[in-house]
Amino acid sequence: MNVLLPTQASFFSSPHRNPIHTPVSPHTNHRMVGRKRKADDDGLDDNMSISPTNSPSLATRQIPRPSKKVRANEISGRPLSLPRLLETLDAQSLRSVLQTICERHPEIGSEIVTSAPRPSVASTLGVLSKYQNELQGAFPYGGSPGSDYAYDRVKQQLTNLIDALVDFTPHYLPPNEQQTAISLSFLDSATKIVHDLPNWDSQSHRHHKDNAYDEISRAWALVISEASKRGGGFQLHSGGWDQTLARHNEQSGGKMQMAVNALGSNLGWMGGNSGVGSGDPDSIRNQLLSGRYGTNQSVPVGAPW
């Protein structure tokens, strides 16, 4: 008698069979699930350990890169800043720069003129003295100092001195300068500079000094006239300026007679019968008032007219 026994699945069945119908032990399934979770946890840890590049925490915790230290040690050439550059310029260089800027921008020149302090008599005389020294230093050694050769050697320095004198003088005249004492103080020193100008042998070279006397004489006359209008005639006499001007005229050979005449007329307008030497008819002051000063000077025999 044939009996059919039910077929049971073997645990050693071929792997090629359908795995879905392969029974799995509950313990084995638990171990696999635990292993899977562990693997997933490891991946999760890896993902958490890597911050995204756009994370805000990354930007705030960035460590300075070594390249910055290298950049700090780099050096390259660059121009000086303005304050340091000005420290290196001497007075002549600074004047040259300012003059160039003012020529390009006239409004800056006007601002400098109005903002700069007024030059004092001492500072101006210092500039003129520099030109005088340059003139004296340009004369050749030996020979006649009034010769044509000497004139050719110092002509430029002579012109520089006279031009400076002509430019500075109007600054100390009214109405630009209202204080008579300052005007007279400058004119006194400026006249001494004119006295010291070279005396040339050639008549054609003497116009430099003659013109300088004419200019300075006109300046004296203007200051005297304006001072008398403001009641400054007393200052002219009490300060001894009448005698100072008389000596200047005598040293110039009468080439400042215009200033002397202006002083005489203005002191006469004030009616100055008081003062030192007023009782002496031959005093310089009385000669100025009467217009006789210089008229009774004798001319030496053989002297040129």
Swiss-Prot record:
Biased composition (Basic residues): 28-37
Keywords: Cytoplasm, Nucleus, Protein transport, Transport
Recorded family membership: Belongs to the cut8/STS1 family.
Subunit note: Binds the proteasome.
UniProt name for this protein: Tethering factor for nuclear proteasome sts1
Keyword Cytoplasm on entry: yes
Cited function: Involved in ubiquitin-mediated protein degradation. Regulatory factor in the ubiquitin/proteasome pathway that controls the turnover of proteasome substrates. Targets proteasomes to the nucleus and facilitates the degradation of nuclear proteins.
Places the protein is found: Cytoplasm; Nucleus
Superkingdom of the source species: Eukaryota
Feature: compositional bias, Polar residues: 1-16, 48-60
Protein species of origin: Sclerotinia sclerotiorum (strain ATCC 18683 / 1980 / Ss-1)
Pfam family, one: Cut8
Annotated GO CC locations: cytoplasm; nucleus
GO MF, one annotated term: proteasome binding
PANTHER family (UniProt xref): FI02826P (PTHR28032:SF1)
Residue segments, region Disordered: 1-75
GO biological process, one term: proteasome localization
